[in-house]
Amino acid sequence: MTAILVVLVHLAFALAITPVLIGVMRTVRARLEGRSGGGIGQPWRDVLKLLAKEPLRAPGSTLVLSAAPVLLMASSLVLSALVPLVSTLALPSVPGVLFVVVSVLLLGTVALALLGLESGTAFGGMGSSRHMVIAALVEPTVLLSIYAISGPVGSSVLSVIVAARSVDAASLLNPVSLLAIVALVVVVIAETGRLPVDNPSTHLELTMVHEAMILESGGRDLGWLEFGSWLRLTALLGLVANLAVPFGVAADASLVGLLVGVATGAVKLLLAG
C-alpha cells in the first residue's frame, strides 16, 4: 500500500511539474534570444487546447495513427512511475530494474517511429530513420552508464542505486561515476530531441527529427504526443538529477519526507532543465 502511494505521488508530481518545466525552459530560451516568450503557463494552455480538438486522420490510415499517441503517453506514465523522482521506495509488483525501464523507454521510441512511417510522407520516413539511429546509440549507452554506476551497489534497481548513493558521498566523485553521468546527460539531450541533436521548435526539414514524425498529427493526437514527449523528458532529467545529486530523495512514505522529496525534486528538475 505504501509503495502504491509513492507511485501515485510520482505520477502526480510528474504530471504537475512537466508543463512548468517546459514553460521555464522555453521562457529562458526566449529571453536569451531577446524575446518575451509566451510565459511559463503557455505549455498548459497549448496542451489543453489540443486535447479539446478532434483529430483529423486520413481515410486510409491504420490503427497506428490513433494508437501511437496513446502508447507514447502510457509508456511515459509508466516510466515516470518507475523512476525514483521523489522517493526511493519501489513498487514490489513492478520492479524498477534497469532493463524494464529501458524497455519502457524503447516502447515509446518505437511508437513514435511507427507513427512517422504511418504518414507515408518523405518527412515522416526521414524523421523515423533518424529517430531509430539515435535510439540505437542511446539505449546501449543508458544500460552501460547506469550499470557502471550500479557496480559498487550490486543492484540494477534504480531506487536502490539512488538510495545507496545518497548515503555514500564518496561514490559521487568516483571518475567512473562522473563519466557515466556525463554520458547520461548526452543521452537525455539526444533521446528527448533537444539542441544540438534536434530542435523541437523548427520546421526545417534538414534538422527535423521529432517534428518530422508528428507532422501529420493534430488535435487530441498531437496533444498526447506532445505531453508524452514532455513526460519522457521529465522522467529522464529526474533520473539523471537524482543519480548525480541523490540528496533530498524521500527514503520513506512519511508526509514530511514526501514533501521534502517533491520540493527538492522540483528544484533539481528546474535547474537541470
Residue ranges of each PLM-predicted region?
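Alpha-helical transmembrane segments of multi-pass membrane proteins predominantly involved
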Residues: M1-G273
